[in-house]
Regions:
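Helix-to-loop junctions at the C-terminal end of transmembrane segments
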Residues: 120-132, 217-218
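Structural signature of the two symmetry-related core transmembrane helices
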Residues: 135-149
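Extracytoplasmic gate region of multi-pass secondary transporters
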Residues: 63-124
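Intracellular juxtamembrane helix-capping segments at the cytosolic ends
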Residues: 173-186
Length: 253
């Protein structure tokens, strides 16, 4: 973001997009070719095919998942990050003007968002291996919840870094838990169709977030009021998840 803001000060935005397109066309195929050239698909795990526990784990089909109430509670939490973060990104100029942060502050804050997202991604893998995704789910949106309070109560430019940093932490957790949680709860045999469903819901939620933010802004809502709407949604989804947190274990046949 900081680089783009700097480039906008010295050249037209059309030139920036054209340069990005050329770089992607040239370097992405080359990088992809060299990275997958010696890709090994063999697993390092030693699995005993006669292990009774592995054979007894229920592998849920998508039609069964749709009928499971736990799916919708987990989805409420999984979809919080996409619709709220997309709303923030699309309407960042509205937030900047409302908080009087200045155009460069929000761009600099995205660096904090990116750094914390990457660090959380790296750390969350270790935590999942140690504690499982099911136990970490309840913590995923807590940083996002706090970020809405930061946006509601504070106006100082420094809070922009805290606000987007907290969103970055939730984003890092959501990116990893969004795949591993479904596999832990519903098994891996039909994970493709389950992930297709959840990905479709995620895409819908990003469009929903953009539309909802725009509608609320048109209705005269302040950014603080929008933050409180987001806070209430996250809080309700967390409370529901809290009550089913001990029922997310895989089922055995």
């Amino acid at each position: 973001p900081v680089l783009i803001v700097y480039l906008l000060s010295i050249t037209a935005w059309q030139n920036i997009w054209m340069s990005i397109s050329i770089l992607v066309l040239i370097f992405l195929p080359l990088i992809s070719f060299f990275l997958i050239k010696k890709l090994d698909f063999d697993t390092r795990e030693q699995v005993d095919p006669t292990d009774s526990e592995i054979k007894e784990i229920k592998q849920w089909k998508r039609i069964e998942v749709i009928k499971d109430y736990r799916f919708y509670i987990v989805c409420l939490n999984m979809l919080a990050m996409p619709w709220i973060a997309t709303g923030v990104f699309v309407y960042q100029s509205f937030i900047t003007e409302a908080k009087e942060w200045g155009s460069f502050v929000i761009a600099q804050s995205f660096m904090v968002y990116s750094i914390l997202s990457v660090l959380t991604l790296l750390g969350s893998g270790f935590l999942i291996d140690k504690f499982t995704s099911r136990k970490l789910l309840i913590f995923m949106n807590i940083p996002l919840l706090i970020s809405t309070l930061v946006l509601f109560y504070f106006n100082s430019p420094i809070t922009s870094f805290i606000f987007l940093g907290l969103i970055g932490i939730s984003n890092g957790l959501a990116n990893v838990l969004g795949s591993s949680s479904w596999a832990e709860i519903y098994g891996v045999k039909f994970i493709g169709s389950i992930k297709a469903l959840t990905t479709a819901l995620m895409v819908f939620s990003t469009a929903f977030g953009t539309a909802l933010f725009g509608l609320l802004i048109d209705k005269g809502f302040s950014i603080e009021q929008i933050a409180m709407v987001s806070f209430v949604y996250i809080l309700i989804s967390l409370i529901l998840l809290f009550f089913v947190r001990n029922k997310l274990n895989p089922q055995y046949i």
